[in-house]
From Swiss-Prot:
Source organism of the structure: Sulfurihydrogenibium sp. (strain YO3AOP1)
Keyword Ion transport: no
Record's catalysed reaction(s): L-methionyl-tRNA(fMet) + (6R)-10-formyltetrahydrofolate = N-formyl-L-methionyl-tRNA(fMet) + (6S)-5,6,7,8-tetrahydrofolate + H(+)
EC number: 2.1.2.9
GO function terms (MF aspect): methionyl-tRNA formyltransferase activity
Major enzyme class: transferase
Gene3D superfamilies tied to this protein: 3.40.50.12230
Annotated protein name in UniProt: Methionyl-tRNA formyltransferase
Coiled coil residues, start to end: none
GO cellular component, one term: cytosol
Family: Belongs to the Fmt family.
Length: 311
């Protein structure tokens, strides 16, 4: 089939690569405009654009897609059999969704109808789920509410964070996408409506959600740290500075101390901090304008001692 691909970040690149390697033909790619990225804030192409250009696939980057006659005409000229959307970043209007023969499908990183919306991977980790998944669904006007072609479960382990789970879901989504497209082409697949009464929403992550409240349980804080490792990063005040906490582990402890208090600062083990119901061993932290370091190095470099407190 002739496929028009809509996508922007790294998550979408796996699906684009799988499409390029499949029997289907990618007739065009629509992605977000180039934006400043990285420390130097240089204008850079999106990851999807970079991949498409390697394969000489036409790339289009409209500033807006609503009421955009030019992009409508472009899509009609490309004449795709189906549009595939993977983390494009904007909601497509109905007039665009309905152009291709087989309409428009989406790779969504949750087990729908759970976690519709913008941040399904982070929310699944933050809420302590032990599994999530990917679904291929038909796009309709309502957000992530279309009929579902297929889903695959993915386990969330204690070792997973936003980076590892993102990659697992991107891989699984790409594999499932090709299977679904092959079956759509052969007319061998049915779609099923979602149970809308069971729908939950994964609202966008806000920067303020990175602030750690050490009176919460060790498990809740551990989930917060690993869910927000890319952005905004979990953080707490220490010596009047905002220190980011990038990696931690739940450990047993039976000492009485205030939440956030350092109960152990060991150059071999690291920093152990009291929480509402237990303790966390902090493994990697980052002081302002510094690189991430192990807590063993932080103890040596910043002379951190037991009795000090994260707030």
């Amino acid at each position: 089939m002739k496929v028009l691909f809509w996508g922007t970040p790294d998550f979408a690149v796996k699906s684009l690569k799988a499409l390029i390697e499949s029997n289907h033909q990618v007739v065009g790619v629509i992605t977000q405009p180039d934006k400043p990225r990285g420390r130097g804030q240089k204008i850079q192409p999106t990851p999807v654009k970079e991949e498409a250009l390697k394969h000489n696939i036409p790339v289009f980057q409209p500033e807006k897609i609503k009421n955009n006659q030019e992009i409508l005409e472009t899509i009609k000229k490309l004449n795709p059999d189906i549009s595939v959307v993977v983390a494009y970043g904007k909601i497509l209007p109905e007039e665009i969704i309905n152009i291709p023969k087989y309409k428009t499908i989406n790779v969504h990183a949750s087990l729908l109808p759970e976690y519709r919306g913008a941040a399904p991977i982070q929310r699944a980790i933050m809420e302590g789920k032990d599994k999530t998944g990917v679904c291929i669904m038909e796009i309709i006007k309502e957000l992530d509410a279309g009929d579902v072609y297929a889903c695959r479960e993915v386990e969330i382990t204690e070792d997973d964070d936003i980076i590892s789970l993102h990659d697992k879901l991107a891989e699984e989504g790409a594999r499932l996408l090709i299977k679904v497209l092959d079956k759509i082409e052969k007319g061998e697949i049915d779609k099923k409506p979602q149970d809308h009464e069971k729908a939950t929403y994964a609202k966008p992550i806000e920067k303020s959600e990175g602030k750690i409240d050490f009176s919460r349980s060790a498990k809740e804080i551990f989930n917060q740290i690993r869910a927000l490792k890319v952005w905004p990063k979990a953080y707490a005040k220490f010596r009047d500075e905002e220190v980011k906490i990038l990696d931690a582990k739940i450990v047993e402890c039976n000492l009485n101390a205030l939440p956030g208090e350092i109960i152990k600062a060991d150059e071999k083990e690291g920093i152990v901090v009291k929480t509402g119901d237990g303790c966390l061993l902090l493994k990697i932290i980052q002081f302002p304008n510094s690189k991430p370091i192990t807590t063993q190095d932080a103890i040596r470099g910043y002379k951190i001692k037991a009795g000090e407190r994260f707030e």
